[in-house]
């Protein structure tokens, strides 16, 4: 007896469905991982989304919840498993797995706990998707991006840390609040470490091409009567504040990661402040990953913009690198 499917559908082509060309995997289905997943789905960036985690019940519940919303999405396949074979042939793998930052805990204090987690995750990712681009989100992101590079054996341009892409978004939001101008029209970068030693590049802050430093040379310094320096302090403190209030951060980092993914999947060539190897730049001679303005396209992180920094900004960037190297040099990575 013929099935309902056989009676309903007449096949014209016997071939199976085409393989996905923009498969995206999210490692970790915690608050950050799911915010990344939802952001990727809503921006319609993937033709297949895979989720992987060691917590089977949580994983099954999350993927069922997303699948039940398939009618409202444009991603035809959403899958999940604790086995990394589900991630096979991913174009982009977003790593959010790891232990969560606690209230008042510096991101750098997380490092050794998360390094041990990555020793399991990264070899599995590369085994099933040797041609993928890896975006590291777990904290401390700069050190874990370095760890991912070492563990994966992949070229530098295919290892990207989410870095200060979110810090810079926070910076632009706070500037926009002070000026009453939309964040997209307030331009400025936070560079260096995603964390306490980040560098606000006040020399480059502008609105419609008008440098704020040209209007107020002391902006961002202790001599500034308008206390713009407080804006950078709020950027540094904001994650701690959100964690104190709601227990974790997730939505803004999810949006930030989806923007990075979009620049790659759509081959946009947009500039993002993301974490990359900075040895040989700005007088830094150690193998550390810090955020600089980078061009992202379909091949990954293809180039770094040589931003003209003032001497004090270079000094802060070097201090940022020294802080990371002080911890990184003693890690047991391999």
Curated annotation (Swiss-Prot):
Chain segments annotated as coiled-coil in the UniProt record: none
Cellular component terms (Gene Ontology): mitochondrion
Binding site for substrate: 139, 170, 249
GO biological process terms on file: lactate metabolic process; pyruvate metabolic process
Superkingdom of source: Eukaryota
Residues reported to bind NAD(+): 30-58, 100, 139
Pfam family, one: Ldh_1_C
Top enzyme category: oxidoreductase
Subcellular compartments: Cytoplasm
Disulfide bonds: none
Subunit structure: Homotetramer.
Family to which this protein belongs: Belongs to the LDH/MDH superfamily. LDH family.
Protein name listed in UniProt: L-lactate dehydrogenase C chain
Source organism of the structure: Xenopus laevis (African clawed frog)
Lineage, highest ranks first: Eukaryota, Metazoa, Chordata, Craniata, Vertebrata
